[in-house]
Amino acid sequence: MDGEELSTYAIAYKGRVLAYADNEASLSCLSYGHIESKEIWSWVQRFCKETECSGQLCFDYMRSSSDGQLYSIECNPRTSTVITEFHDHPGLAEAFTDPESVQSVIKPFKNSPPVYWFWNEVVTLLTTGQVREWWREVSQGVDAVFDPSDPLPFLGLHYMHVPVLLLRNIWTGRPWKKIDLCIGKVVELGGD
């Protein structure tokens, strides 16, 4: 099916949605910004209520380019990187630690900057040459890992962890197709 890809992340407790975020998606989406889709929000609320589920839920959707319909194409009962949309929201922890005390649905702040992975954006710039788009993304967003007060995770991921993984694949002769900085792994051919 061809069309627009969308993703959500939700925390539910006994059928009630406690936290919710959504975004435009793509394979290995590495840039996150809340889009506040009313249609998807209603779908997630209805699903959680009807199933009385508790836990973390990640849904992927496709809006068909042929009929305009929204189709739910995947559900993963786990944390998703869409959770990064809450990077500046202090209330998210409450959904995990004290779900019964959550009074209203926790959503990313409307003025929250989108999240990106810097080296992914550099590769995008080098492969597309879209300087204005790159600058807009980098200047208006925040890096998922970099924090000026604690740069070690950023340095460790990009200059130690990923290079060691690449060297391992080169040394063992295992072919790879991409580096996924979001989850800190080298995706091998035939892998996920």
Functional labels for PLM-detected ranges:
Residues 1, 49-52:
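Short, solvent-exposed secondary-structure boundary motifs
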Residues 1-45, 62-72:
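Phosphate-binding site of ATP-dependent enzymes
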Residues 10, 51-85:
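Conserved metal-phosphate-binding beta-hairpin within the catalytic cores
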Residues 14-16, 25, 33, 50-51, ...:
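Domain-wide signal for the mature, well-folded portions of proteins, strongly enriched
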Residues 25-32, 76-89:
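Glycine-rich phosphate/pyrophosphate-binding beta-alpha loops
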Residues 41-44, 58, 72, 76, ...:
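A general structural signal for well-ordered alpha-helical packing
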Residues 95-192:
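Peripheral (often C-terminal) accessory segments that flank ATP-dependent C-N-forming ligase machineries
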